[in-house]
């Protein structure tokens, strides 16, 4: 069900509903940690569950010559997978977050395609935070500066228009 419909239904019924937000676990922690956190919350009948998306971090490694090498690392990957696992296990709507920061339009398109294949049709489009090494938010060179641009990309994909300019016959499951 569309989250907007869930909210509108709660309003029309004058029923208080809530949702909770999950942080993907640190890389290396498995789904059991997520399920252990989610299990007691499901007894409270949440309207839906938000799954955050975290930007990449920068790890510095000092070389033998004293220079510094920078590595891009994702400490909390798994938003798409966690979203699918929670929806399947608990039969609750999930709202994975998609962010502009650290992702190209192509990365975002791939994530949206994966979400669609998994039957996940709600997303929360956000600009996202600046990276830890940035003074100000800097978009990916092939990405979006503002969340409204991300929303436009999502809307275009829903019309079958892809980043590479291809237009495909679109069906909505």
For each predicted feature, which ranges?
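Flexible, glycine-rich active-site loops centered on histidine and acidic residues
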Residues: 104-152
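Glycine-enriched alpha-helix->loop->beta-strand junction motifs that scaffold or abut catalytic
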Residues: 45-46, 90, 119-122
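N-terminal amphipathic alpha-helix/helix-capping segment at the start of soluble metabolic enzymes
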Residues: 1-20, 165-172
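Catalytic domains of carbohydrate-active enzymes, especially glycoside hydrolases
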Residues: 36-52
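Alpha-helix-loop-beta-strand connector modules within alpha/beta enzyme cores
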Residues: 63-96, 142-171
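Glycine-rich, proline-tolerant flexible connector loops at the mouths of alpha/beta enzymes
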Residues: 25, 47-79, 131-139
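Hydrophobic faces of well-ordered beta-strands that scaffold small-molecule active sites
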Residues: 18-24, 47-51, 94-98, 123-125, ...
């Amino acid at each position: 069900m569309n989250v907007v419909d869930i909210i509108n239904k709660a309003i029309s019924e004058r029923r208080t509903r809530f949702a909770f937000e999950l942080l993907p676990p640190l890389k290396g922690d498995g789904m059991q940690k997520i399920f252990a956190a989610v299990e007691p919350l499901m007894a409270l009948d949440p309207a839906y569950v938000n799954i955050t998306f975290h930007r990449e971090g920068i790890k510095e490694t000092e070389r033998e010559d004293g220079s510094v090498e920078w590595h891009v690392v994702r400490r909390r990957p798994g938003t798409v997978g966690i979203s699918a696992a929670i929806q399947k296990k608990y039969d609750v709507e999930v709202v994975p977050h998609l962010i502009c920061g650290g992702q190209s339009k192509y990365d975002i398109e791939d994530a949206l395609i994966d979400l669609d294949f998994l039957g996940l049709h709600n997303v929360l489009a956000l600009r996202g935070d600046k990276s830890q090494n940035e003074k100000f938010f800097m978009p990916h060179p092939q990405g979006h500066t503002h969340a409204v641009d991300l929303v436009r990309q999502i809307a275009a994909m829903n019309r079958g228009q892809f980043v590479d300019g291809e237009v495909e016959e679109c069906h909505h499951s």
